[in-house]
């Protein structure tokens, strides 16, 4: 049995699990950028051929999920990961900084921005291995998430609930 979610399963999950309250996002998808062409982190680092293919699969997977906003850090690899879905949905990718003025990862500003700009939307955030866990935590997830250096296939779905912490689903694509 494959762990790969298909669009029909994802659509059913969204319809069944999404809250109708306008007090929070309907859902937030969070992914790490797809495979990069180099092991270097010095910009600009584009996606590899495998990474470009994964970005296209992500677009195919989320095309019917109701995504109405896409956020990405301002690196080539994250923007290239977001690009196929943004193009398909005719959305402009919104850039965000994953670090505070001290250079350390700070996800709280993005969490506040998502809440204020997209109160009733389904959102996709494309980040990095070191920014995903802090973002999920800033969005209220209680589970501890670790992303390995070679892990590019995680797709997190955070669904707010009327009370208590949000539901966090971890899938692979």
What is the meaning of each model-derived region?
Residues 126-128:
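Short beta-strand segments
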Residues 11-20:
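Bacterial N-terminal signal peptides
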Residues 25-120, 132-134, 138-173:
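Active-site-proximal alpha-helix that buttresses catalytic centers in soluble enzyme cores
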């Amino acid at each position: 049995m494959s762990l790969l979610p298909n669009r029909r399963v994802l659509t059913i999950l969204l319809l069944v699990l999404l809250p109708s309250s306008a007090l929070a996002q309907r859902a937030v998808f969070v992914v790490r950028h797809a495979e990069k062409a180099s092991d270097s982190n010095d910009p600009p680092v584009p996606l590899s051929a495998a990474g470009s293919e994964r970005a296209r699969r992500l677009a195919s997977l989320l095309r019917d999920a109701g995504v109405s906003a896409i956020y990405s850090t301002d690196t080539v690899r994250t923007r290239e990961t977001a690009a196929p879905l943004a193009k398909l949905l005719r959305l402009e990718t919104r850039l965000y900084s994953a670090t505070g003025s001290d250079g350390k990862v700070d996800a709280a500003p993005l969490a506040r921005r998502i809440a204020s700009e997209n109160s009733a939307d389904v959102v996709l955030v494309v980040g990095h291995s070191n920014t995903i866990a802090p973002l999920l935590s800033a969005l209220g997830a209680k589970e501890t998430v670790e992303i390995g250096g070679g892990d590019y296939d995680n797709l997190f779905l955070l669904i707010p609930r009327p009370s208590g912490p949000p539901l966090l689903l971890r899938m692979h694509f």
